């Protein structure tokens, strides 16, 4: 049976880059790997994919193949058939640092076989919360308190997991490494892979007598009040991190972190401006303030502020109050501006006395609206 074109096997072209060929190979090797694909013919396709990649990812072999095709390797071309080396040889000879562990480590959940020593104890799990703030809290910061159900280091055994420290022994299966080597059959090849020890669950220890409080886990569950000091200069959607305030590690490592995502209470008064430290404040004035240009006192997040209304102001106009917006960041004292967005209130009804005065004003006014038809 004639061999298929190697480019066709991998689904690439002669102009494909080395990285594109590697990417195509990765996908197909995983797709047809015998441990992942039990369909009939998968193993043969897996071998075919490996053979194609071993040529197209070797610059010399690829050049010969592009010139002579399959004949370059069957001894009829005058070059002599170099043949295909072992499976491991193929990976070790491929360029760009690509090797067996890079491609298949995720198939078995472990790292590269025989290349790493015992990993350190894993970090505790992180916790995620959302803190919904008022605009004043967002600008100036606030201390929030909340109750968390935490995994904490056992108070009785101090995380050892045993009644007495002398009751702790090295795991006899992994010799304290926390990981063991297992053999995986990959078609005609056998590969060693490093995985977590199933006897000690990666801890590397065994217990003669487990702690009665935590049953050997080294941790216990506790409800705890946590104070969260949220600083100034935060932004909705931003995450504030408290290191070491998450769950305790099950393996004696460092605790996880507490991530607080910032939210904001909806307001009819204040508005945020995307990608800006300025803050909009909606403010209603009377039609008399708009006409006369009065001075008003407005209640801002910083307290009362005097604001001069310009004569003839219109609804939607912005009046700037400097340095009363959001802080630039958590450490800066510089702030954006407060933009007062004017809304003019027109009364729907007036008293007889007001109406009389308005009529007199109307007589004095020289305003003549233009006829838009003209």
Curated annotation (Swiss-Prot):
Places the protein is found: Cytoplasm
Residues the record lists as binding Zn(2+) 1: 154, 157, 211, 214
GO cellular component terms listed in the entry, alphabetical order: cytoplasm
GO molecular function: ATP binding; heat shock protein binding; unfolded protein binding; zinc ion binding
PROSITE patterns: DNAJ_2, ZF_CR
Extent of the CXXCXGXG motif repeats: 154-161, 171-178, 197-204, 211-218
UniProt-annotated binding residues for Zn(2+) 2: 171, 174, 197, 200
Entry domain remark: The J domain is necessary and sufficient to stimulate DnaK ATPase activity. Zinc center 1 plays an important role in the autonomous, DnaK-independent chaperone activity of DnaJ. Zinc center 2 is essential for interaction with DnaK and for DnaJ activity.
Family: Belongs to the DnaJ family.
Subunit structure: Homodimer.
Protein name: Chaperone protein DnaJ
Organism: Mesoplasma florum (strain ATCC 33453 / NBRC 100688 / NCTC 11704 / L1) (Acholeplasma florum)
